[in-house]
Amino acid sequence: MKIIIAPDSFKDSLSAEGVAQAIAAGLSEVWPQAQLIQCPMADGGEGTLQAIVAASHGELRRQAVRGPLGQTVEASWGWLADSRTAIIEMAEASGLQLVPPGLRDACTSSTFGTGELIRAALDLGAQRIILAIGGSATNDGGAGAMQALGVQLFDAEEHTLPSGGLALARLAHINLEQLDPRLAHVRFEIAADVNNPLCGPHGASAIFGPQKGANPQQVHQLDAALGHFADHCAKVLPKDVRDEPGSGAAGGLGFAAKAFLGAQFRAGVQVVAELVGLDAAVRGADLVITGEGRFDAQTLRGKTPFGVARIAQQHGVPVIVIAGTLGDGYEQMYAHGVDAAFALPAGPMSLEQACSEAPRLLQERAADIARVWRTAAKR
């Protein structure tokens, strides 16, 4: 029996690799002779770098860069030498996990460090750069990253703008003369799981600003500032992309990557699946098991189980989901290739307990699934 194990990470609990290992351990109890193929997955957010580098036998590199609030951080990024491809997970340099909850500041946080990672990839001769842009602490429209790459932003008095999205309200003009010329020879791809525009009620500031520390007044100010930034970008760049799906991803980094770098926007799970060879692995399999921390209606928006189920469906392979919790609307996934879904806790349990005991719970649930499958096969 050939089983593909392709889960995402369980946030604040286990990495995708840890989830896959626990599921494999449970299946092995019942099917010791089964061919278990572990394909840890991600959707452009947390774990994307790790999943791609591990599956591609790439190199994990480290770079000291400027963090979201100006502090120096050691960020990891991936290098696939054979294809001269760099994997940059922006959360490594500009992520929410780098800022304690009490210090989160959507108004002044910057993506400058992400730009520094791009520059490091250019120094190594990258021909393709994949930007995984989930989990950001920033709301600067990607301005900081572009400044790190040579874009100059000035106010009316010819002073360089300080970091952060709020400062963009004072932008008077953009100078592209110092933009790194190597960028023109690189193919950029954005791997993300959101398709919001830059501005408006569904834009970066309104939807994601509050979780980054913005109050209602600041959300309004940031939205206006990003709109002002987009107005000026439209004057010096060939295309206005503010309303394109994904421009609001990562506090507007999606906008800057599209506008300045010509980046192609792709569903994060699609990019990861391609690089880890999921389609080839699923072909001929008897079962696919995937999962994530919370499985609900939001999964339909390009989350890992959705992407995995679509691939399995194309090959007629059944899919079972194991999730930390089953939320509202998860049943909708039954129309998109999922055959069954199970939550981890077998009884009342706190979130903290479920997270700490996730390996054991995953192993038990996987073993239970295998026993039911085996029993059904005997009939």
Predicted segment positions?
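N-terminal loops that bind phosphate or other acidic moieties
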Residues: 1-133, 137-379
